Amino acid sequence: MRKRISAIIMTLFMVLASCSNQLEAEKLAAESKNTFFDSLVKIGQGFQDIFGILEMQLGDALGFNAVKSGDKKSKVGEHFKKIGDGLTTTKDKLKELSNKISEAKNANSSTIEAVKSAINSASDVFEQLITALTKLADTAKEAGDTNIGDNADAVPGAAEKTGVEAIIAGVKDIIGAAEKSGVKIEYGNAGDPIATAANTTDALAVLGGNTAKATQGAGDKLAFEVSKADPWAIIDKIKNAKAADGIQLDAGEKDAGTLAASNNNASANAGAESNAASSSSWLFLMQLSKGGKFSAAVADAGAVKAAAVSAVNKVLGVLDFIIRKTVSSNLDKIREAVKGIKYSEITETDATESGDAQPITNKSSN
């Protein structure tokens, strides 16, 4: 009888101990999941903060009317610098987020690595954009405090080759970063050929026609060509342009980089086969480069400035669009990776302490 009672007591003790251990295990599991969910909340909050900061810093900078008549060339540099600064802040915040993710408790290691990989990829793209924007900002700054569309003395001036080269390279790098991120770059519609600089009233005469000085009417024609130019086609012309030293344009010159190098007395047929897009592209190249200025009659001074401002805003607008799409594409990839973070009952510490001889079953759940 006594042995039976002892056996019953022992059985009850074992049952109670088992229940206690189970309750403790369930408590620890619940605490682990709570810690995991707390980590997810912090990660999510950090990601939302990045979106907020980016929108706040870039919201005012991005747009299709970055400059206006009377603004200096350096204003374009300020525009690029503001966007670059915003991307730098975003890149720094992504690094902080990566550190937070590394500290996440009870998270499946492979899903954590997927997020960190997405962040690293985005950071590389942002760095490429920042470098390109810095290059463009520095070039515009070096162009000085000359007004956009400067034609004060009615004598054309060639854009410096080094400046034009830097602009072309900067635009190419931005497009390269976008394409790397899966953003589609359009070619646009370049438009029909426009009249060459045979007459002083032709649009291209402001480059330095065969009489060296444009006369009244050329400015209005140039403004008209720029107004109908497709921004995507302008970007394509800039991307494929080749910089040149200051020259007197020969007949048939139509490359945007070469047109921007016109310094005086162009051939009567200079600009043959040029179109609205190429006209706008060399206007932009001249406005961001040191030395670039136009020939215009006094009565056309305002029209030439308006044409230059319009060309600059069209290019800035499409570049801003490309940058925004590129940034959004990379942040969306990070967002999807964050959504894929899974819970794991096995922490890195647990795995280390268990030793190599004992295989570990990694239990994961969404």
From Swiss-Prot:
Signal peptide range in chain numbering: 1-18
Cell compartment(s), UniProt: Cell outer membrane
PROSITE patterns: PROKAR_LIPOPROTEIN (PS51257)
Record keyword Lipoprotein present: yes
Lipid attachment locations (S-diacylglycerol cysteine): C19
Lipidated residue numbers (N-palmitoyl cysteine): C19
Sorted UniProt keywords: Cell outer membrane, Lipoprotein, Membrane, Palmitate, Plasmid, Signal
GO cellular component: cell outer membrane
Membrane association type: Lipid-anchor
InterPro entries xrefs: Borrelia_lipo (IPR000680)
Other observations noted: Genes for both Vlp and Vsp families are on (usually) unnamed linear plasmids in B.hermsii HS1.
Family recorded in the similarity comment: Belongs to the variable large protein (Vlp) family. Beta subfamily.
Role this protein plays: The Vlp and Vsp proteins are antigenically distinct proteins, only one vlp or vsp gene is transcriptionally active at any one time. Switching between these genes is a mechanism of host immune response evasion.
Protein name, UniProt field: Variable large protein 10
Gene: vlp10
